[in-house]
Structures are given as C-alpha cells and as structure tokens.
Amino acid sequence: TAGNTGIGLTLIANAKGYHSVIVMPETQTKEKKDLLKSMGADLRLVPAKPYKDPGNYVKYSKTLADEYIQKTNGNAIWANQFDNIANMLGHYNSTGKEILEQTEGKIDAFICSSGTGGTIAGVGKALKEFNKDIKIILADPKGSALYNYIKSKELIMEGSSITEGIGSSRVTANFAEATIDDAYSIDDKDAIPLIFKLIKNEGLNLGTSSGINIAGAIKLGKEIGPGKIIVTILCDLADRYKSKLFNKELLKEKDIPIPEWL
C-alpha cells in the first residue's frame, strides 16, 4: 500500500484481533509511516522499484504473505490491495449507490483519480447501470501512465507529481473493471493551489488526491458547461502529507505557488 488503505486495513485488523503486516515504499510521507506504527502495524519499508522488479512493494508483500501462510499453516491472507476486486465491489455496493441517492439520480458525470482503481471502477459501474449516459472521467496526475492508457491504450508515463497513492504504471485488476469515457492529465500546479484555497476559504483540510480530483472536476465543469451535476470524491486529508504539502522548499523547487501563510 502507499499508506491509506493500509491504515484502514490495520484498524480493521485491530478490531478483529488480527496481526497486520503492512508493506510500503520508503518514499511515502513520514506522517503515514508514523500513523501506521502508532496503530500497531508491523510496518515493512522497501525501496521504491518498478512493478516488474521482484523487489517492488506489491511483489514483496506477496512473497512475505506466502511465508506467513506457510509458517502459520494457512492462518494468514494476502490482502492483495490492487488486484483484489473486493475494493471495486465495495464501491459498487456502497459509494455508487450513495451518490445516486444523494443526487436523486440527477448526475451528469463522475470524475476521480485512480490508485487501487476500485473507486472509479465500482462507482462507475453503479452509475452506468443506472444510466449509461452518465460520463465517467479519470483525473490522472502527471507521472502516471493511466491517462495515456485511456487515450491510446498505451502505458506511457510523462512528467511527475508530488501526489502519493494515485496514478499507476500498470492496469490493476480493479482498474480493469472500469468503464471510462475520457481522461484528463492534471498538473500539480493546478491541483495543489486548490488545496490551499479550500483550506483558506472553505475550512476543508484536504490531501493531494482530493486536489487532483477537484482540479479534474473544475476542468470537466468548464468543458460541459453550466447546469450540470458533477460528482467527485474528497478522499484524503492534508495531515498525511504535511511534510510535502507545506514544505516551502519543495513547493518552490516544483514551481508550485506557496500559500501566503507559510
């Protein structure tokens, strides 16, 4: 995990009396690492490596799970976050239906980013079953290959982003379930200032994935015009990224406008 799903799984494991082992790339923020440790997770940090490398965090977690399964006589499971479509089904059975209830079915488009891929796939499936004309759009950070995959069926990565846990160099089993009409490639220079604006003007303390989602929703709104209902997901908090989001040196280096209060 890049952290957030691991945090959720650790809380569930604690409540169920299970031991949780969380594998994460060492490049993720200190805040997420500290939170996992404080909740009692057995945190294993590994160097960030491409998916094809056997040392990649997903591959390593599978190797580790196999060892635990053998050691415990089958009394362990590999959550397999990215390719376990329980994630997509969870959003299909809950989030998608909740959106339809709250909008009374009057929704023109849904847009969000993809990390595991379950949100866009599950919500999209529920919405398309209700009305096939509802547009499902991907908001993809720079440095991810999914934008080009939707546009041309080629996994090509361009640029970079300070966001974590969204974007991918591959098509996960969850993402493969998605029916996506279009995609936007979102620059940090458009997304991050929106996070600061929402803190100041709306009292919303949101994280980087939410910033990408909101920037995508605004772009979509400008494209399809007034009088439409667009839904996105505010899925993370700024607290988990403060060492990046509120790091003046990093923002300056990435040419992202620095909020006046920093």
Give the ranges of each region predicted by the language model:
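Generic beta-sheet signal
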Residues: 23, 46, 81, 137-139, ...
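Active-site-proximal loop->helix
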Residues: 5-66, 142, 146-154, 171-172, ...
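Phosphate-binding loop/pocket of nucleotide- and phosphate-handling active sites
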Residues: 215-262
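Active-site/ligand-binding loops adjacent to catalytic centers
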Residues: 58-69, 129-208, 245-262
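Active-site/ligand-binding-proximal alpha/beta "capping" segment
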Residues: 69-114, 123, 177, 181, ...
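Buried hydrophobic positions in well-ordered alpha/beta secondary-structure cores of metabolic enzymes
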Residues: 3, 13, 36, 79, ...
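Glycine-rich beta-alpha junction loops
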Residues: 82-86, 115-118, 140-145, 170, ...
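Alpha-helix C-terminal capping segments
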Residues: 6-19, 37-39, 122-131, 215-225
